[in-house]
């Protein structure tokens, strides 16, 4: 595309627009980019009327996670984040642990990937600095099928999104499983993916632009 193989070129999906000067359009929607975004893009932003992304559902299998197998009481509140480690940062983790601290009978589940040791260390260190026992942090291993992964999301009462790199596929899966989700809305494409998906699903009560609001509501 950099050599202009077509008279009109557009990009879509991915992390954001490419910035390549030979690209004419970047496909977006009313929510995934803020109103003033055109000031910062070399391409013409082409906003579809509702959403830039649509799916027709997901296959879901039988879950292989149970609260009792993880030592979680039946009346506990379970928070879950299914993002990879590179989407975490100290500020997001601090906020997640503050939420956990405000809900005494709660647990935080997170997915284990290749970077799980570093992520576990960050989560445990932050939890301990907030006076939270590491027993309330439970790593969840990878599964063989995406259908099982989606089914396992059902163990959560609330899914906590990451910021400034939101979920995308994981957000769609969460919505498909009808699980409440809390996200923070930023000014960049990657920080507004969950926002546009939730808005298009008619959900507006758990999208925030301010950290304190995110923490207080939860």
Describe every region a protein language model picked out:
Residues 24, 45, 136-137, 206:
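Short, conserved active-site loop motifs that form the nucleotide-linked donor/cofactor pocket
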Residues 209-218:
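Conserved small/polar residues in nucleotide/adenosyl-binding loops
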Residues 178, 193-206:
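Acidic, glycine-centered active-site loop in nucleotide-sugar glycosyltransferases
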Residues 139, 165-167, 200-203:
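Active-site-proximal binding-pocket segments
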Residues 1-20, 146-193:
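A donor-sugar binding/catalytic signature common to diverse glycosyltransferases
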Residues 3-63:
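Active-site-proximal region of nucleotide-activated glycan assembly enzymes
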Residues 83-88, 112-115, 162-165, 184-189, ...:
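Short, contiguous acidic/charged loop-to-helix segments that flank catalytic cores in large enzymes
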Residues 50-144, 152-154:
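Conserved catalytic-core segment of nucleotide-activated headgroup transferases in glycan assembly
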């Amino acid at each position: 595309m950099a050599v202009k193989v077509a008279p009109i070129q557009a990009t879509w999906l991915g992390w954001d627009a490419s910035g390549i000067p030979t690209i004419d359009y970047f496909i977006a929607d009313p929510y995934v980019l803020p109103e003033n975004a055109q000031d910062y893009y070399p391409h013409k932003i082409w906003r579809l009327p509702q959403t830039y992304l649509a799916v027709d559902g997901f296959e879901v299998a039988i879950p292989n996670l149970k609260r009792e197998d993880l030592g979680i009481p039946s009346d506990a509140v379970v928070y879950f984040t299914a993002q990879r480690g590179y989407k975490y940062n100290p500020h997001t983790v601090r906020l997640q642990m503050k939420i956990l601290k405000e809900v005494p009978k709660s647990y935080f589940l997170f997915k284990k990937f290749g970077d799980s040791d570093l992520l576990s260390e960050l989560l445990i260190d932050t939890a301990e600095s907030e006076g939270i026992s590491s027993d309330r942090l439970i790593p969840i291993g990878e599964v063989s099928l995406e259908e099982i992964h989606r089914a396992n999301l059902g163990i959560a009462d609330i899914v906590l999104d990451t910021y400034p790199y939101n979920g995308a596929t994981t957000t769609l899966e969460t919505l498909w499983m009808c699980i409440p989700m809390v996200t923070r809305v930023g000014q960049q494409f990657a920080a507004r993916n969950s926002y546009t998906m939730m808005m298009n699903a008619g959900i507006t009560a758990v999208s925030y632009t301010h950290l304190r609001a995110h923490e207080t509501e939860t």
